[in-house]
Structures are given as structure tokens and as C-alpha cells.
């Protein structure tokens, strides 16, 4: 298992992932990642055995499900195909929850590093059970871990980024980038709730806008011969159809065929879905479509067709890093590209107008951990 993986079913269809840890681990090459119980991202050590690790600042984990109003007039009718698709996903996530309750007895997340402004002390002890102890901001740790404080951003090893809109920087990327074994996209799907959020990320305005934007992404020119494409999408049937329609879908336009339909199921700290599974208004999961070039002879394990990634959600718009989930199907030292990225990954490229968002030092702290070997 990877460092961020807390549980994986024997058939591989269910993976319990710690979301912040998946992003922390992606700041290093896979070979440098430690086990879940060990400190992550060790950047410096002191003579008394104290190690400093770079930790991602997270939001408090949800302890109870969200309350969301259902439509007063009931749900809008869905096409038959969309109804079947939703029922299949619902069955998958229900099965994933049952798998966890039956075969897993550990925690559903690792200790989180909360923002200093949210750490409420009570008699000198933090009251949030999920806060990582012994933390400081990068400025106050600068004399201990100077390598983490140079410049405004933290850059993972061998990471590359192209900052700008797709339209403005497409030529630059095509001229400078290699072909990629895996391409991950997190498009800015039109989303009213994202528009309402203060400081929310940029989203497309209309369905026509997002289609034009995706059509402008040169996937055929960027993808290696046997490469994979993973694309996040909302639960809106029109967007799923926009991607997968055999007649005029974006995947078909890119010369790709669908090989996997994964789901990211968001749960509370006690493994309850953050929203009712049968909610007509909002779903507790997000689809992740996996595709490859048409005619590819690659053979996938059975669990790749339908897989459920389970995790406790974090800050809005922050998704699990899936590098270590797709790596087993890729050649060693594969090259990856994340499009519409908001953070960087070691050894990968990132492309978009907000690629450095979560790489800012303000999103990270240095946390102290004592060496068990010395007891200091």
C-alpha cells in the first residue's frame, strides 16, 4: 500500500485514502514516500533527533453529514441511461461502505495540520483530535529548515509547470513538453456553489464554454502511445454525456475510449457519507473517468472498471492525488501531466492558470516529530 492508503480491499475495488497525505506524498518521488505511521516529507533533522516535516494545512474534517435541502418539487426527471448510471454508482459506493465497516477497524483519516488560526487551545492542549502537534509556520521554522523557505512557493523535485490559460499557453506547452504516460484533468465545470464561494476557483460560465475549452486541449498530441487519461467530472448527466457520448463526446474527439469509471466517495470522520447516497439534489461522490487511446492493447485488472476511492474531504476544490493509484499500470519513472492543476506533483508537469495555488508557503507548515530511535 502507499503511504496515504489506509485500507484497500482484497479485490482492489475499494481504497481508503487520506486526502492531505496523498498531496503531501506527491511532493516526493514514490520511492521516497514513507509508510502511513511514519513522518512524511522529512526536510531536516536536528542533533537531538528532532525531524521537521512539511505538512499541508487542512480544514477541520467533517464529523457529521452535511444538511442540504432537497428540491421542493422533487428531482428533475433523468434520461433512462443516466438513471441506470447513477444506480450503478450508488451500488458501488454502498458496497464500499459495507466493505469498510466489515473489514476495516482503523481510523478513517490521519492527523491533520490545521491552520494556526483554527487551533483553539484549552489549557495548553489543542481540542481538535485531528490536529498534528508541534507545528510552526514556515517563517518561524526558517532557521531550522531553510530549504523550505526560499521564495514564495515550494517546488517538488523534477516538477515543471506552465502557468497561464489553455488558449494563451498551448503553443508553449506543445513546444516544450514531452509526451505523457498519464494525463489528469480537473476541468472548471460550471458550478453555482463554486461561484458563490469567496475566493473560489474560476469556473466556466456555460456548457458551451466548457466544451470549447476541453476541445482546445491537445490531448492527442500530448498523450504517449499507451498513455492513460483521467478526468474529474461532476454528477450532472449533461457533462457526463458531453465526455462519453459515442457520437460527439469529448473522449471520442480526443481518440479515446472509456476503460474505467471510478468514484470518489466523501465521508465523515465516522465513515458516514457527507450527503445521503439517495439524495436527489447533491451526491456524496464525484466521478473520475479513466480512458486510453482507441485500439490500445493494454489489459487492465478487473477492479479498474469500477473503483471507489473513499476519503474524508478537505478544503474546497482539493481532490485526492491519484498518482500512486495509477502508477502500477504505468512504466517506471512515468511522466505525468495535470491540466487545470492547483498544485504540483514531483516528476510531473502541471498546466493551468492556477497551478501554484496550493504550492504557496502559506498553505504549508513545518511540523516537528521526535525520532523514536533516540527518544528525543
Swiss-Prot record:
Record keywords, A-Z: Autophagy, Methyltransferase, RNA-binding, S-adenosyl-L-methionine, Sporulation, Transferase, Virulence
**Could you tell me the EC number(s) of this protein?**
2.1.1.348
Q: Does the keyword Methyltransferase apply?
A: yes
Cellular component (GO) terms are: nucleus
Q: What results from gene inactivation?
A: Affects vegetative growth and conidial formation and results in increased sensitivity to various stresses. Decreases pathogenicity and activates plant host immune responses.
Q: Name one GO biological process term.
A: methylation
Region Disordered, as annotated, extends over 53-78
Q: Which SUPFAM superfamilies match?
A: S-adenosyl-L-methionine-dependent methyltransferases
The record's section on InterPro entries has: DNA_methylase_N6_adenine_CS, MT-A70-like, SAM-dependent_MTases_sf
The organism named in the record is Pyricularia oryzae (strain 70-15 / ATCC MYA-4617 / FGSC 8958) (Rice blast fungus)
Q: Quote the catalytic activity from the record.
A: an adenosine in mRNA + S-adenosyl-L-methionine = an N(6)-methyladenosine in mRNA + S-adenosyl-L-homocysteine + H(+)
Family statement: Belongs to the MT-A70-like family.
Q: Does the keyword Metal-binding apply?
A: no
Q: What name appears for this protein in its UniProt entry? A: N6-methyladenosine RNA methyltransferase MTA1
**Job of this protein:** N6-methyladenosine RNA methyltransferase that plays a crucial role in fungal phenotypic traits, virulence, and stress tolerance. Mediates the methylation of mRNAs to produce N6-methyladenosine (m6A)-containing mRNAs. M6A is a modification present at internal sites of mRNAs and some non-coding RNAs and plays a role in mRNA stability and processing. Required for appressorium turgor pressure and regulates autophagosome formation during appressorium formation stage.
What's a single GO MF annotation on this record?
Answer: methyltransferase activity
- EC class, as a word, reads transferase
Query: Pfam families, from UniProt?
Result: MT-A70
Give the highest taxon in the source lineage.
Eukaryota
Amino acid at each position: 500500500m502507499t503511504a496515504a492508503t489506509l485500507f484497500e480491499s482484497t479485490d482492489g475495488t475499494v481504497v481508503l485514502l487520506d486526502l492531505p497525505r496523498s498531496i503531501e506524498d506527491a511532493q516526493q518521488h514514490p520511492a521516497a514516500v514513507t509508510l502511513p505511521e511514519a513522518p512524511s516529507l522529512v526536510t531536516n533533522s536536528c542533533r537531538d533527533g528532532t525531524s521537521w516535516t512539511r505538512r499541508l494545512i487542512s480544514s477541520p474534517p467533517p464529523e457529521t453529514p452535511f444538511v442540504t435541502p432537497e428540491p421542493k418539487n422533487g428531482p428533475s426527471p433523468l434520461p433512462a441511461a443516466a438513471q441506470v448510471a447513477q444506480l450503478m454508482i450508488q451500488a458501488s459506493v454502498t458496497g464500499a461502505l459495507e466493505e469498510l465497516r466489515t473489514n476495516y477497524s482503523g481510523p478513517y483519516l490521519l492527523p491533520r495540520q490545521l491552520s494556526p488560526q483554527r487551533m483553539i487551545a484549552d489549557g495548553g492542549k489543542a481540542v481538535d483530535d485531528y490536529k498534528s502537534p508541534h507545528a510552526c509556520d514556515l517563517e518561524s521554522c526558517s532557521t531550522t529548515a531553510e530549504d523550505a523557505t526560499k521564495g514564495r512557493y515550494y517546488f517538488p523535485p523534477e516538477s515543471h509547470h506552465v502557468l497561464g490559460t489553455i488558449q494563451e499557453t498551448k503553443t508553449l506547452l506543445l513546444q516544450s513538453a514531452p509526451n505523457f504516460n498519464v494525463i489528469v484533468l480537473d476541468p472548471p465545470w460550471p458550478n453555482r456553489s463554486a461561484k458563490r464561494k469567496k475566493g473560489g476557483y474560476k469556473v466556466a460560465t456555460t456548457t458551451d464554454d466548457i466544451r470549447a475549452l476541453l476541445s482546445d486541449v491537445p490531448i492527442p498530441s500530448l498523450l504517449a502511445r499507451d498513455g492513460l487519461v483521467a478526468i474529474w467530472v461532476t454528477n450532472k448527466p449533461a457533462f457526463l454525456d458531453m465526455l462519453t457520448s459515442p457520437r460527439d463526446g469529448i473522449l471520442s474527439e480526443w481518440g479515446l475510449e472509456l476503460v474505467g469509471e471510478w468514484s470518489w466517495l466523501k465521508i465523515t470522520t465516522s465513515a458516514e457519507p457527507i450527503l445521503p447516497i439517495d439524495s436527489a439534489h447533491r451526491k456524496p461522490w464525484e466521478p473520475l473517468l479513466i480512458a486510453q487511446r482507441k485500439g490500445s492493447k493494454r489489459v487492465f485488472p478487473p477492479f479498474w472498471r469500477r473503483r471507489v476511492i473513499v476519503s474524508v474531504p478537505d478544503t474546497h476544490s482539493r481532490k485526492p492525488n491519484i498518482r500512486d493509484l495509477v502508477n502500477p499500470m504505468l512504466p517506471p519513472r512515468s511522466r505525468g501531466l495535470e491540466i487545470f492543476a492547483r498544485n504540483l506533483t514531483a516528476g510531473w508537469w502541471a498546466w493551468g492558470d492556477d497551478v501554484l495555488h496550493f504550492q504557496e508557503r502559506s498553505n504549508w507548515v513545518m511540523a516537528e516529530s521526535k525520532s523514536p530511535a533516540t527518544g528525543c
